[in-house]
Amino acid sequence: MAGLVKKTTGLVGLAVCDTPHERLTILYTKILDLLKHFPKHAAYRKYTEQITSEKLELVKLEPDVKKLENLLQGGEVEEVILQAEKELSLARKMLQWKPWEPLVEEPPANQWKWPI
């Protein structure tokens, strides 16, 4: 990691991460490992895997934190870490919910018709 470690994020309640590359690598790897348990045809798996792989590649290639923040386009690197933590949490929930499975019962006719 090139350059000095910043003293503050400038965001209330969001502490500076001393090892952002390591933290992001761990989070993105956990997300990708979890996605392997999803069916290959699941839309959530396809798109989340693609986005997460791209971000992980950027983390591996760019040692400078400021440049990495610009490449990831998610604000401060600490905000990106927070986003990755939330994505990991969502992936765990999606695995429980199994949205790729068929509905338990058919929806009522005209359920999505508007106006009624």
Curated annotation (Swiss-Prot):
Keywords: Acetylation, Electron transport, Membrane, Mitochondrion, Mitochondrion inner membrane, Phosphoprotein, Respiratory chain, Transport. GO terms for cellular component: mitochondrial inner membrane; protein-containing complex; respiratory chain complex I. Transmembrane segments: none annotated. The modification N6-succinyllysine is found at K98. It comes from the Eukaryota. The modification N6-acetyllysine is found at K30, K46, K60, K98. Pfam families: ETC_C1_NDUFA5. It is found in: Mitochondrion inner membrane. Belongs to the complex I NDUFA5 subunit family. Accessory subunit of the mitochondrial membrane respiratory chain NADH dehydrogenase (Complex I), that is believed not to be involved in catalysis. Complex I functions in the transfer of electrons from NADH to the respiratory chain. The immediate electron acceptor for the enzyme is believed to be ubiquinone. Its main location: mitochondrion. This is NADH dehydrogenase [ubiquinone] 1 alpha subcomplex subunit 5. The modification Phosphoserine is found at S89. One of its GO terms (biological process) is respiratory electron transport chain. The gene is Ndufa5. The modification N-acetylalanine is found at A2. Complex I is composed of 45 different subunits. It is a peripheral membrane protein.
